[in-house]
């Protein structure tokens, strides 16, 4: 037999071997939409599209920011202005050019050669765009657990455990510490009479054009319930960031406490000094009693689920009921969490910055990210 006749057979055998190895090195996981997704045995390059907190959650879970090949600009701004980029500077090398708001540039995405793309689960159009390009898209849901922040964080951690089994035991450690904090807060707030529970108004977005709160179908409802408080806007049924208020409605609620998220550039002093055009917040009880607070900015914006969720619950409970948590050293608990869960040791200055974020925390955070429902 001549070498020329033999060559095609060798090539065919080589191709078959390569395909066999490829098949053996792939595995199938089920995402939050129930879709089966084939991923490599070891995932090394991930693009986080429009499920914004996942860039930080992924980095914290794996302990490696270089795994994030691309992320949404709104995720990047949180990384740059919060602790993520400081603790994992390699994450700031991630590309952001593949997406603008809800518009995905498929060619730019493909150029990143991701092993996996994480997509907001309700965004079927974007999932289809990614999969049609031959890329593995895993749907991550922000609402499957009915906006229960801790349960959502648990669900996301379960997904990360499936996708990154090499981080053996990380999920169990996160769960143990989360339950510890949950139990502490629940035990210390369970005997508060209904009439004595703090009435809290979350301000998700705020500027001269709009006031957006959390009604009963968004994360603010969970935060209030878990911390032993009452959501002042519980009567609003609008889901997600669609519960818009007039100033008259705010006066009607007259909450005991106002919590500003990091999806707005507003800071507590803006409400006290009338810096928001066309709005007067000064008559509110919360403003008069100096009980307007800005949520922490840790690895990501803490109103949403993420790697800082248990710490955020502890911060909120201590902020609402300082006497009941007087013995809790939040700085110490924060350092402990980051050392055990994230694998880094925070300085006093880093802890201070986490709990006193400035306007930059909201940079780029208000843009829409879903291409469709």
Question: Which residues are covered by each model-predicted region?
Answer:
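Bacterial N-terminal signal peptides
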Residues: 9-20
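A short, structured surface patch at a secondary-structure boundary
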Residues: 48-111, 116, 232
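Proline-aspartate-enriched helix->loop->beta-strand connector
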Residues: 99-101, 106-122, 246-263
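Extracytoplasmic substrate-binding proteins
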Residues: 36, 126-209, 233-234, 287-288, ...
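Sec/Tat signal peptide C-region and signal peptidase I cleavage site
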Residues: 21-25
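Alpha-helical, coiled-coil/dimerization segments enriched in small aliphatic residues
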Residues: 214-242
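Structural recognition of the beta-strand scaffold that forms the well-ordered cores
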Residues: 47-49, 69-72, 116-120, 137-140, ...
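Short helix-initiation/N-cap motifs at beta->coil->alpha
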Residues: 32, 93-106, 237-247
